[in-house]
Amino acid sequence: MEILVIDGQGGGLGRQLVAAVKKAVPQAVVTAIGTNSAATSAMLKAGADRAATGENAVVVNCRTADIIVGPIGIVIADALLGEITPAMATAVCQSSATRVLIPVNHCENYIVGVPDQPIGCLLYTSPSPRDKR
């Protein structure tokens, strides 16, 4: 199973996601794609099997992923303070992969019905990649 974790900024959420996925599904191949080198480095240190940085890396890896995990901003062009390009958002949305999106209320995007919670709490309520069937 190919699991793609996408994150930007400092990679803090991505780091937590990589660690959680590796623990929940140790046999999965986890690819970390950062919108910048800091995010990529944080996810690689958390145990990603492989990593890359930038727009083209997102576009290429969305083609082969079984599951894509990241903050909801990865499907919104110009989110994450402009780090998500329209091409990145389109690649995530058009991928045949199952998307597991973490509801983060930042950058003028608010998810109605989702209270502000610490990221750790959200990770425990996220579906496991094993739930994909």
Predicted regions and their residues:
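Short, ordered loop/turn segments at secondary-structure junctions
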Residues: 8, 35-38, 56, 74, ...
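Single conserved hydrophobic/aromatic residue that forms the stacking wall/gate
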Residues: 124-133
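Hydrophobic/aromatic beta-strand patches that form the interior of the parallel beta-sheet core
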Residues: 31, 52, 98-102
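N-terminal beta-loop-helix "entrance" segment that forms/cooperates
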Residues: 33-52
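Glycine-rich phosphate-binding loop
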Residues: 50-88
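Ser/Thr/Gly-rich flexible loops in soluble cytosolic domains mediating phosphotransfer, phosphorylation
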Residues: 84, 89-123
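Short glycine-rich or small-residue beta-strand-to-loop segments that form or flank ligand, phosphate
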Residues: 2-7, 68-75, 100
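Glycine-rich phosphate/diphosphate-binding loop of Rossmann-like nucleotide-binding domains
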Residues: 4-34
